[in-house]
Amino acid sequence: IKREPEKVKVKLIEYYNDDTSYSKEVLNQMGKANSATMINNITQFEPRLKLLMDQIFECLKDGRKILVLSDRRDHLKDIFYQMSLQEEFTYGFYLGGMKQSELQETETKDVILGTFTMASEGFDCKYPLNTIILASPKTNIEQAVGRILREEESKRKKIPLVIDIADNFSVFSRQKLKRIKYY
């Protein structure tokens, strides 16, 4: 983020694994990268999920309020399941199709699990968020990152933190470079 480093921290985690269930470049009939299939592979890869969970728990132990965003609901369900194995922290979904009362209940949780779509469509959390974890590859993140910058600077208890898990293969390497330019 093109701001002073003491106002926002960015933790870029470059991730790669040569296991083909994760890193195989899949092409469509036109010979172009099939991002949708590859994102499915990325979000279903257990070692990457473990890294993601480690980041979530590290932030929670630091007293952070976290928004975890993914393009895949199944990915969020996997994270939800991992969160359910502990009892110390609260967590909930913020997804399309949920009742307003359920969304408001989720806003009170330590960890909000949402889709990029929901975070960009009128997401207005009344409780200040200070951490966003980009759990699946994405190019345009400006609006999502803005969700942790809403609290007035003088009222912040923590410096806002962006954790970007950057997949280092195929089209995702280029997406990472676009995000770095934004930061």
Give, region by region, the residue ranges found by the protein language model.
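Conserved RecA-like helicase motor-core motifs
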Residues: K65-L67, F80-S101
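Short, aromatic/basic amphipathic alpha-helical patches
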Residues: I79-Q86, Q175-Y183
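Conserved RecA-like P-loop NTPase helicase motor core
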Residues: G96-Y182
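Short, high-confidence coil segments that cap the C-terminus of an alpha-helix
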Residues: G63-R64, F89, K109, P128
